Amino acid sequence: SATFSHGSFCYIPPDTHCPLELSTYFRINNKESGQFERTLIIADKNSYVSYLEGCTAPQFDNNQLHAAVVELVALENATIKYSTVQNWYAGNEKGQGGIYNFVTKRGICIGNNSKILWTQVETGSAITWKYPSCILAGHNSIGEFSSIALTNNYQQADTGSKMIHIGKNTKSRILSKGISAGYSANSYRGLVKIGPKAHYSRNYSQCDSLLLSNTSKANTFPYIQAQNPYTKIEHEASTSKIGEEQIFYFLQRGINLENAISLMISGFCKEVLNELPMEFAVEADRLLNLKLEGTVG
């Protein structure tokens, strides 16, 4: 990405706290076209930046391709927060059209006490493959990944994260929420690797899946590698459906079915939505409910 010709480049000087939420907007307008933008963000010592990314596309019967590369570099005591709300066209109810979303996202915490936070809300595209990663090279560095992946109709989403611990006393957290409706398939695929010299490092992973139909699928594929005995790794996973008792509870209180489903979806995703900036969180919550209109009931 050092030689990319288009996209975004952001450098935060030492001892600088960026006062604004930097943002970009990507859109694919043409039929059968591809978008290959590059993003490079470098946060120097003792700096902070929050970067927002939004994606949309018009409806076509043909497929388009989005294959971007995002690279984050955090130096000593620096923090980078990267948030994405992805709403590419997902195709029609029969699975025709839509964007193929194949994205490479990676970050490296080079300096000690550095931090990279990935937050993403995936609601669009016909097929999504995305695995944001953190290489925790600096001692005491932190990597976090928070994700909501919603699929409906014939969408396929294969998302997750990679946390590679190299420095000592490094910490990582993975929080994944998957919602499947229609005939869609939603998979979490993640790697947690703690190297031989990453003593006293720790990882916590939580993968929750919610099924909204009898024909949708949810999968979890965690890969865990611990190469020294002084580490702690925790992994939790759950798969559930919205039960009749829950719906009955809302109906008894005068809340109709559509609003009941909306409230339950918001509660299921609350932990991830709270990681987004306030304006983004409100819009992302509305987007999730909009994508599921008419799905249940």
Curated annotation (Swiss-Prot):
GO cellular component: chloroplast
Biological process per Gene Ontology, one example term: iron-sulfur cluster assembly
Keywords: Chloroplast, Plastid
One Pfam family hit: SUFBD_core
Chief place of localization: plastid
Matching NCBIfam families: sufB (TIGR01980)
The protein, known as: Iron-sulfur cluster assembly SufBD family protein ycf24
Species per Swiss-Prot/TrEMBL record: Antithamnion sp. (Red alga)
